[in-house]
Amino acid sequence: MVDGMQRANQVINLTPAEVADGLREGRLLLVDVREPNEIAVERYPEAVVVPLSHFDPADIPDPQGKQVVFACRSGRRSVTASLAAQDQGYPYNRHLAGGILAWKAAGLPTETG
């Protein structure tokens, strides 16, 4: 704690395997916060796109009981999105650690084109 100020919000790191399992089991809603030009080249299957450049957590579809998990290219923007959502009162505190780079390194599928 520094000068009585501590950020209450935290972000939980999930591995690519944890996210893939959660998607397969219907427990997670994956939200890709990369920009449209990045997604046009390569994207996560089943992800909802809410670009960080104009991020509003209200734009995320109702997760209907699923846990929201943010994802990006390397894991930095997904942390930013999670913290921004939490700052606005949303309980979205999980992200894909390592982003799509880790996802692909784990041998998980992406869609291209």
What residues fall within each predicted segment?
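Rhodanese-like catalytic fold shared by cysteine-dependent sulfurtransferases
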Residues: 1-29, 35-69, 76-113
